[in-house]
Amino acid sequence: MIEKLSNLLHQRKVFNRITLLMGKEVTIKTAVYTNGRLLIYVDTESHRFTFALTPEDEVQIVAIDDIFSISDLKLQLKIAEIIQSHISLNNHWRDQ
């Protein structure tokens, strides 16, 4: 399941949107979390955003690390929105 999510999030379409939004190179990683949730990490040199994907494919903000301003929080919300919309448009990803 982690590999499927990783493949979905590394499609150029979503990866490019997040990179463009951040204005710098990003790294996206996935990992297992408790209660059937999958963690999604979006890292840059200056920020690390952590999200959880629920079994119902809902993206949730897990941790607010390195948030120093309202603009940082807005950025995290925008990334969550990009990931959520990409997962919603590819709702068959778990079956592949």
Positions of PLM-derived features:
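Acidic, low-complexity, intrinsically disordered interaction modules
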Residues: 30-73
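Intrinsic disorder/low-complexity segments in short proteins, especially the signal peptide
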Residues: 10-14, 25, 43, 58, ...
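Mixed-charge, Lys/Arg-enriched low-complexity segments
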Residues: 2-8, 59-96
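N-terminal cationic leader/targeting segments used for protein routing and processing
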Residues: 17, 25, 49, 91-92
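Negatively charged, low-complexity tracts enriched in Asp/Glu with abundant Ser/Thr
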Residues: 1-37
